[in-house]
């Protein structure tokens, strides 16, 4: 993002207030984590984060980070499958953290990402494992596009009803508690072949950006959904994951399938809102473009200065990246966003978070409750 040292320091100072001191480390416990039974015993318990962190730091030092990631996430054994589920928990925060480590080749950050995954829950297992088992029954079935699956999810009122039945965790306590098989049957129809990895990575990125930006209410000011935003923020790392030579083609396929299935589930969990492409294409930026030769420059500079917890800058960065990797496929119908749609989304993002109403994000865009405090949109003056 080309932020200056002074901006980085300013943003760190802005966010340091909620940083927590690490829990004390139990050296004996860290040693015992080498035993698979002991390793499993402490999973999902936040207070053991620091112990898992020290453990994974040691494992990476001894084995190399590539071998550790393959062993603990992609070995296709009980422990690795469980950790992979946890990596997608917490609305994708563990895999986002791991992604930064892989992108910038930082083993210390990778250890943090693995430790985060270890202390998250595995309640998404029925979705991911159930979808794999269902898909395996029809191995020759052609994949549906992600847009097809969003439309299918929207056509199921029972999914919206399940998601709307709780305000706590709409995936766990709504979709998976009440309509798990319906959700599994939908997402199982998305699958990836090894020779499709690049185009499917781009498609996933395109669709995540589309439903994040297009879930608007025409009578309300532009706002992005907080949960949807994580889907596109995470997508940037899949371009990196898919080009790691230490990761097998089979595991690249699996990782990408899980990400696509997670995206459809996330869309349904927020009430499957209408997706309005015209809201993107007709948007009038608050600050006109200054330099057409470098159209992202002003947006990036503004979001770097904007004081938040980093979500805005992650989103702008992911959108600019999405434009680049989707460009070769823009003539394909499953790629909804084209050309300057990405830049429009960049303007929508920075304008919405800078808005004086102080509402940076909404939560659960498909439900009226998400929009109740958002100002009404001013009508254009003729």
Can you annotate each of these PLM segments?
Residues 1-382:
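Mature, well-folded catalytic/scaffold domains that follow N-terminal targeting or propeptide regions
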């Amino acid at each position: 993002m080309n932020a200056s040292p002074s901006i980085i320091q300013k943003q760190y100072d802005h966010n340091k207030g909620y940083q927590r001191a690490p829990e004390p480390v139990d050296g004996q416990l860290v040693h015992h984590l080498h035993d698979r039974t002991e390793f499993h015993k402490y999973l999902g318990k936040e207070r053991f984060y620091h112990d898992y962190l020290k453990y994974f730091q040691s494992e990476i030092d001894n084995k190399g980070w590539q071998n550790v990631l393959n062993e603990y996430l992609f070995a296709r054994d009980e422990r690795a499958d469980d950790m992979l589920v946890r990596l997608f928990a917490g609305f994708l925060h563990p895999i986002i953290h791991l992604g930064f480590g892989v992108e910038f080749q930082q083993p210390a950050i990778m250890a943090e990402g693995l430790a985060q995954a270890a202390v998250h829950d595995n309640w998404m297992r029925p979705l991911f494992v159930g979808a794999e088992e269902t898909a395996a029954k029809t191995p020759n079935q052609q994949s549906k596009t992600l847009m097809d699956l969003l439309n299918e999810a929207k056509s199921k009122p029972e999914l919206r009803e399940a998601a709307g039945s709780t305000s706590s965790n709409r995936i766990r306590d709504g979709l998976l508690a009440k309509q798990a098989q319906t959700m599994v049957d939908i997402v199982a129809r998305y699958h990836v072949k090894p020779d499709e990895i690049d185009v499917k990575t781009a498609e996933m990125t395109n669709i995540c950006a589309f439903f994040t930006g297009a879930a608007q209410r025409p009578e309300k000011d532009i706002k992005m959904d907080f949960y949807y935003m994580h889907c596109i923020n995470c997508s940037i790392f899949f371009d990196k994951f898919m080009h790691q030579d230490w990761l097998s083609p089979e595991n690249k396929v699996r990782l990408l399938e899980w990400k696509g299935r997670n995206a459809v589930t996330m869309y349904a969990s927020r009430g499957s809102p209408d997706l309005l492409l015209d809201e993107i294409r007709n948007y009038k930026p608050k600050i006109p473009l200054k330099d057409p030769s470098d159209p992202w420059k002003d947006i990036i500079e503004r979001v770097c200065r904007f004081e938040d917890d980093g979500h805005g800058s992650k989103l702008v960065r992911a959108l600019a990246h999405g434009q680049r990797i989707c460009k070769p496929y823009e003539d394909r119908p499953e790629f909804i966003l084209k050309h300057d749609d990405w830049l429009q989304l960049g303007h929508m993002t920075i304008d919405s978070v800078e808005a004086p109403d102080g509402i940076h994000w909404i939560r659960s865009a498909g439900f009226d409750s998400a929009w109740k405090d958002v100002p009404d949109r001013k009508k254009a003056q003729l």
